[in-house]
């Protein structure tokens, strides 16, 4: 994992077409602006993990229901 420091209005490029820019700093909160092509998904990790876990739970429930129908 690469760890770097950036100040307000400084940016990082990822590949040729993704830019992550620091647009604000307020105490422990950092506001980022991300520019990327439309085909690139940009997700907050905590939301992604929550949705993934809920999908796994739903799948497990569906498997149990299907097995009970045999």
Curated annotation (Swiss-Prot):
The keyword Ribosomal protein does not apply. It is found in: Cytoplasm. SUPFAM superfamilies: CsrA-like. GO terms for molecular function: mRNA 5'-UTR binding. One of its GO terms (cellular component) is cytosol. One of its GO terms (biological process) is bacterial-type flagellum organization. InterPro entries: CsrA, CsrA_sf. Keywords: Bacterial flagellum biogenesis, Cytoplasm, Repressor, RNA-binding, Translation regulation. It comes from the Bacteria. A translational regulator that binds mRNA to regulate translation initiation and/or mRNA stability. Usually binds in the 5'-UTR at or near the Shine-Dalgarno sequence preventing ribosome-binding, thus repressing translation. Its main target seems to be the major flagellin gene, while its function is anatagonized by FliW. PANTHER family: CARBON STORAGE REGULATOR (PTHR34984:SF1). Homodimer; the beta-strands of each monomer intercalate to form a hydrophobic core, while the alpha-helices form wings that extend away from the core. Belongs to the CsrA/RsmA family. This is Translational regulator CsrA. It comes from Clostridioides difficile (strain 630) (Peptoclostridium difficile).
